[in-house]
């Protein structure tokens, strides 16, 4: 629940091994909570954070020798870096040291935590982050034996992805007759394109409409007990089938170079349709489940 009309900022450490099992990382309520709750976690933001708004785009321009001007050939959006200062709190020097150790324990090398942002009117969203190289480097002039508060310690996080993620979302495609399976859903994302994953159940052969200017895409017949997954993300485009024993088969070699391209429109209703073309077994005409589309919303900014 959002505290009044404030923005809640929470850092969640990555999962860690406690010697017997994997446990969730600790949560630190950094801002937007009553002071008593921040004191319980032991860390708060000292000031604001920089790097939360729109990501920085790099324009790549092709210029010719001895020719004025140039051509914009690409726009690249790189990583995101967030920086600020934190206070480490406690009712005694021993408690401050405890919170200090906990904060660092939840920022292990190369392990990604999550920096969450909650507002009353917007979707919850997070950055997948590691601490920056210079995080925590400062001089504390107070006697360590009397240290009951660390103030304005420089801190920062870096994310190798420029956008904020929302909660992963799944929608079943319901049968509407004549072999058509449809889902209509709102995509809250604010980035230009979101690439979903499509899960197709065993029991049939399916056809997808890829949109304007693209041909239809047909799967091969999917055996009962198997599931086919198509990921449309161009960075990791995949088409695999998992059988009833858990074995995976890469199906791209069977597609003769065909690579379906689908993305979801931001901040609007999206309609997604697949069509059942034929049954895998005419003597057992049923599917293992409904088809399903899954995606993770992405946002340009923290609000």
Segments the model singles out, each with a brief description of its role:
Residues 1-60:
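Polar/acidic, low-complexity leader/linker segments enriched in S/T/G and N/D
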Residues 19-34, 39, 125-132, 215-222, ...:
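Short amphipathic beta-strand/extended segments with alternating polar/hydrophobic composition
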Residues 44-83, 137-142:
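Short, solvent-exposed beta-alpha or beta-beta edge segments that form flexible loop/patches at the rim
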Residues 67-95, 147-163:
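Oligomerization/assembly interface segments of phage tail-like spikes and tubes
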Residues 76-80, 107-109, 147-151, 190-192, ...:
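Solvent-exposed loop and beta-edge segments used for protein-protein assembly and interaction
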Residues 87-134:
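Short, acidic/charged, Gly/Pro-enriched secondary-structure junctions
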Residues 114-164, 294-295, 303:
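Short beta-strand and beta-hairpin "edge-sheet" elements
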Residues 167-303:
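Intrinsically disordered, low-complexity segments enriched in serine, threonine, and glycine
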């Amino acid at each position: 629940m959002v505290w009044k009309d404030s923005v809640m900022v929470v850092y969640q450490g990555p999962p860690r091994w406690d010697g017997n099992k994997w446990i969730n990382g600790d949560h630190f309520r950094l801002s937007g909570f009553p002071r008593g709750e921040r004191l319980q976690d032991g860390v708060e933001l000292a000031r604001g954070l920089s790097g939360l708004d729109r990501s920085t785009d790099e324009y790549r321009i092709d210029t010719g020798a001895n020719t004025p001007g140039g051509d914009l050939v690409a726009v690249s959006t790189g990583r995101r870096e967030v920086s600020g200062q934190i206070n480490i709190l406690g009712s005694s020097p021993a408690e401050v040291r405890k919170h200090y150790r906990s904060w660092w324990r939840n920022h292990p090398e190369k392990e990604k935590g999550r920096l969450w942002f909650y507002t009353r009117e917007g979707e919850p969203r997070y950055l997948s982050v590691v601490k920056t190289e210079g995080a925590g480097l400062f001089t504390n002039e107070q006697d360590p034996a009397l240290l009951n508060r660390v103030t304005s310690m420089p801190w920062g996080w870096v994310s190798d992805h420029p956008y904020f993620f929302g909660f992963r979302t799944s929608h079943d495609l319901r049968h509407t007759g004549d072999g058509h399976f449809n889902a209509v859903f709102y995509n809250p994302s604010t980035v230009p394109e979101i690439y979903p994953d499509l899960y197709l159940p065993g029991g049939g052969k399916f056809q997808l409409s890829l949109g304007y200017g693209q041909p239809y895409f047909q799967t091969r017949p999917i055996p009962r007990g198997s599931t086919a997954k198509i990921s449309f993300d161009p960075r990791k485009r995949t088409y695999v089938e998992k059988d009833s024993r858990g074995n995976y088969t890469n199906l791209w070699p069977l597609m003769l170079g065909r690579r379906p391209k689908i993305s979801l429109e931001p901040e609007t209703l999206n309609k997604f349709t697949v069509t059942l073309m034929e049954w895998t077994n005419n003597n057992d005409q049923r599917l293992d489940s409904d088809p399903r589309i899954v995606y993770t919303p992405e946002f340009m900014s923290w609000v």
